[in-house]
């Protein structure tokens, strides 16, 4: 764990996973609506296994610090309420501070850092790329990205967007709008897993998890990050 001093005088806790080598580029993991729980911690560990220093900040610190909700129907309802209470601009500001903190860690080589966001975090990763300068972003089923495509020109880094073909919360038309913009950016990529819905990567949520879609998307994420923010490890 790491404690990040914040500009407002408070602090923000963050989970940190180190690669076997002890050093590597950074990967800022932006949480889903359930908070920094087992799934997000495991996402950090998966990235650490690829050679990244992974950090997941508690972006609910302005709502309820340390909020971690179960991946079941009751938890989903509570998580959606918590996400509605979250100020998106404030969360992007907190993510920007976390990105700087990650880059300043002695274990992070050359200050290089990507952002990888899931669900809520996918949208926040996009917002972070507008507001700051991550070296790359990976956005897993980020709702609201299609409505912020007018800001795409402000993003200067490579980007990979994942969507599920059967997403219950993001219309297919939104994914297609993102695809149209991606076609104009040679450093942007999009993948739609037709057999996946929303949160298909979430192994903690049986109602959403689709292992085949997860495996394909993770391979794309791995290869994208290897090109955009290489670690030297495979």
Regions found by a protein language model. Name each.
Residues 1-234:
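N-terminal cap/leader regions of alpha/beta-hydrolase-fold enzymes
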């Amino acid at each position: 764990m790491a404690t990040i001093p914040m500009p407002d005088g408070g602090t923000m806790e963050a989970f940190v996973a180190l690669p076997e080598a002890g050093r590597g580029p950074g990967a800022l993991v932006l949480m889903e609506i359930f908070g920094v729980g087992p799934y997000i911690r495991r996402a950090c560990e998966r990235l650490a296994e690829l050679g990244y220093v992974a950090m997941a900040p508690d972006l609910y610190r302005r709502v309820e610090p340390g909020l971690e909700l179960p991946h079941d129907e009751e938890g989903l309802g509570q998580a959606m309420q918590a996400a509605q209470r979250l100020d998106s601009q404030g969360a992007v500001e907190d993510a920007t501070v976390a990105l700087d903190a990650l880059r300043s860690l002695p274990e992070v080589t050359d200050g290089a850092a990507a952002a990888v966001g899931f669900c809520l975090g996918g949208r926040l990763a996009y917002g972070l790329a507008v507001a700051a300068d991550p070296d790359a972003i990976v956005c897993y089923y980020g709702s609201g990205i299609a409505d912020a495509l007018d800001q795409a020109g402000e993003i200067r880094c490579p980007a990979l967007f994942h969507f599920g073909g059967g997403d219950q919360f993001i219309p297919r038309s939104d994914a297609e709008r993102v695809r149209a913009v991606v076609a104009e950016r040679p450093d942007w990529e999009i993948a739609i897993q037709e057999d996946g819905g929303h949160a298909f990567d979430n192994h903690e949520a049986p109602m959403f998890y689709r292992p085949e879609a997860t495996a394909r998307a993770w391979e794309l994420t791995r290869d994208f990050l290897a090109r955009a923010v290489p670690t030297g490890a495979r």
